[in-house]
Curated annotation (Swiss-Prot):
InterPro entries linked: rRNA_ssu_MeTfrase_G, SAM-dependent_MTases_sf
Function: Specifically methylates the N7 position of guanine in position 518 of 16S rRNA.
Main location: cytoplasm
Source species, domain of life: Bacteria
UniProt keyword terms in alphabetical order: Cytoplasm, Methyltransferase, rRNA processing, S-adenosyl-L-methionine, Transferase
Gene source species: Streptomyces coelicolor (strain ATCC BAA-471 / A3(2) / M145)
Source lineage: Bacteria, Bacillati, Actinomycetota, Actinomycetes, Kitasatosporales
Encoding gene (name): rsmG
Protein name: Ribosomal RNA small subunit methyltransferase G
Amino acid sequence: MSEAAELPPVPEQARDVFGDRYADAVRYAELLAEAGVKRGLIGPREVPRLWERHLLNCAVLSEVVPEGVTVCDVGSGAGLPGIPLALVREDLKITLLEPLLRRTNFLTEVVELLGLDHVTVVRGRAEEVMGKLPPVHVVTARAVAPLDRLATWGIPLLRPYGEMLALKGDTAEEELKAATAALSKLGAEQTSILHVGEGVVSPLSTVVRVEVGESPGGVRFAAKRAKAARTGRTRRRRG
């Protein structure tokens, strides 16, 4: 590894957080520092803070993800938060959704190399796959878009009474306030700001949780989902 991409020492907390998958987490960090930088998936300046700012920051999201649910990581990029979440939670079924080919190629390589059998990589935009992918219990996202825009992509992918978990920074409260009207139209019934990672990361990771009701995405998307379901049933009968 070049000096410019020198990884920092692995924090002691990583062993506790990743457990049996600790070695895989280390390998993932190495892949980000090497192939991730070469392919332009992360900037070289991020390498010295890969553990604190990226891997651990994302892994602690697991604290607020229910057990045994389906997850779609929207705009997964280099796999953050999807891959750290997958490493600490093998009870989840995770889809990494990413539109760019060079990123999905990297994600596929990582998933295969680390043996993440509970993870699927899908190339596409959220608005393109709605109705094609099964609705999920949880949508995750990090550094994708402001909350109001992110919600228009993420919420329609949810099952009824699902939730979107967006990792945000200092702007979380401001973004949530600005997105109130948009979230309401999309079927959001409850919102909250959570702080996770006590004893693992400092500052704590900030998560905006958006819980939806019976019609995630609102009436417009409920109609689209119903049409997609009817089309799917027709195709199965013909098959």
